[in-house]
Amino acid sequence: MAQQLIKAFVITSALFVLASCGNSVQDEPSPADSTDEIDEVEEPTPEASAETDPWSIDAEHFTQTETVDGQEVIQNPDNVAVLVNYEYALPEGYEPEDLVVPDVTFSFDEDVEKRYLREPAAIALESLFEAAVEDDIHLFAVSGYRSYDRQDAIFSNAAAERGEDIASETIAYPGNSEHQTGLAMDVSSESNNFLLSEAFGDTPEGQWVEENAHKHGYIIRYEEHKVDVTGISYEPWHLRYVGEEIATMMVEHDLTLEEFFEKATAI
């Protein structure tokens, strides 16, 4: 009788264990029965990329060139951030279509081409000059847009007087001048006798320009400590419009336009 009871107990226990195991298997959802959705991986948007990469700028700001007779000729000269230097040249016949006369004080009265700037640069220059007056600083515009032919005449005369190598240290070859873009303006002051000279950088007006130009989208294109990068002697009077965003980035990181585009990425 005892053996029968033990046998019955063992059988009952086994059935209980099997029943428990069966319930455990059913409680575990199979992959096919799972209703959980897998989150899709989203591609980063241009806005998100710009937030994570501080050097991101619109692709349209990069200079596009094509090799013509061994010279890199710019194909998008209307780009306000266009890089013009000894390596990258503007098309010979290029003339901006939006040239206007900025409403600022000039050092001369004649209505000649150097009075003009491209419209975005002209508006920014007006803002710059107005801010200067508010700080009791009085600037004078001296030389803006310059055609290819005019630059050719200026360089040829300087080369004849001083030699081509010496002339090229301060005067760009025709096609390689930022003045042809309509985005550059040379400025001076009465305290500097309206001259375009290094001494302007030591005047109150020149120091104000160095500290504030970028707030209005302008940079001092040829800095004294960057001659080895630009290949151009120090020109505290030469202001180049590139837009507030790029100008601020350049000043904050002490970069020339050449150095900036080595770091910048397109979005």
Regions flagged by a language model, labelled:
Residues 1-26:
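Sec-dependent N-terminal signal peptides of Gram-positive bacterial secreted proteins and lipoproteins
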Residues 21-143, 148-267:
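Extracytoplasmic cell-surface/polysaccharide-interacting catalytic and binding patches
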